[in-house]
Curated annotation (Swiss-Prot):
Serine protease inhibitor that inhibits trypsin at a molar ratio of 1:1. Belongs to the venom Kunitz-type family. 01 (intermediate) subfamily. It comes from Cyriopagopus hainanus. Its main location: secreted. It is found in: Secreted. This is Kunitz-type U15-theraphotoxin-Hhn1q.
Length: 88
């Protein structure tokens, strides 16, 4: 591999880092709170019936979770949901 290719790769990776680094530090991604709380409810792939809570953008709403899969916008109690997702 020639020196020109190595320098091109280093330059590309440097630019990529400079462009993406501020996004990684933004409030939307810092602790995952906003991203998690913006996800839709997802009952998962199984057919169990567990009462769980998800944040719908305004408040926490009860839904039935199937027991496997789904996403991180799923909480065991309304209180846990509000503590994670409600804006202070």
């Amino acid at each position: 591999m020639g020196i020109a290719r190595i320098l091109s790769a280093v330059l590309f990776l440097s630019v990529l880092f400079v462009v993406t680094f501020p996004t990684l530090l933004s409030a939307d991604h810092h602790d995952g709170r906003i991203d998690t709380c913006r996800l839709p409810s997802d009952r998962g792939r199984c057919k169990a019936s567990f009462e769980r809570w998800y944040f719908n953008g305004t408040t926490c709403t009860k839904f039935v979770y199937g027991g496997y899969g789904g996403n991180d916008n799923r909480f065991p109690t309304e209180k846990a949901c509000m503590e994670r997702c409600a804006k202070a």
